[in-house]
Amino acid sequence: AASDVYKRQDLEGQPIIPALCDYVVDTSRGTTIESGGHRVSTIEHIMSALWTLGVDNAVIDIDAPETPIMDGSACAYAKAITETGVADQDAERKFYHVTEKMVYTIPEKGVAIILYPDDEFSVSVHVDYNSKVIGNQYATFNPGDNYAEKISPCRTFVFLHELEPLIKMNLIKGGDLDNAIVVVENPVPADQLEHLKKIFNKPDIEIKAGYLNNLELRCNNELARHKLLDLLGDFALLGVRIKGRVWATRPGHFANTEFMKQLKHTIRRAGE
């Protein structure tokens, strides 16, 4: 199988960590892989760009335990790959043709990932967090779509009420929000808004249509597109490309990587 590997240049012996779903050890805040006690975390954005833009067998040199978050999207990675260009390797690319429908669900969380047989690879994502701000959002990625333009610039998002405990424990610094869209679901009292202005060192911070105005949205379904970006990054951990149509509702790194393990097992059984 054609898989990418991370090389931890900051550690003695420059250990290698394969970017495969078998090595996933944590999905709480992004996807983390580990081999021989060495980890690399938040790999999904760079994996998304590499995989979708057709790069296999990459060696990713890294001098830290986490990939650079950049602006919270895969834009910088996609731009670098597109500008550098991709060279053909002297090897045939392996594809797994999906032969039967495969379903993965976490019913209590409303999560579902379904894979159907198809001649091409495509992904549709639906997000619904019972949020009056986000509402129902859909995003699709079909063969021939421009990933670098359409998907890679879409940034990660977080709900303000999820941030509040972290803010109270001083785990969030001012610059931390330059790479996340903050969704404000509930009314924010004036004193809390003042507190946010101080933390983020932005005196003109305000809430606009349910979002903190630290960032402008890049498109109206940016959140669904970002979930799609993440899902593509987790698909990269299969180590083989597939021909099939994916439909995902409320995907997340735990569900994505569990689904990949299940799919990998199916592929192994099929002996491809």
What are these regions (language model features)?
Residues 1-56, 61-272:
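C-terminal regulatory domains involved in ligand/effector binding and gene-expression control
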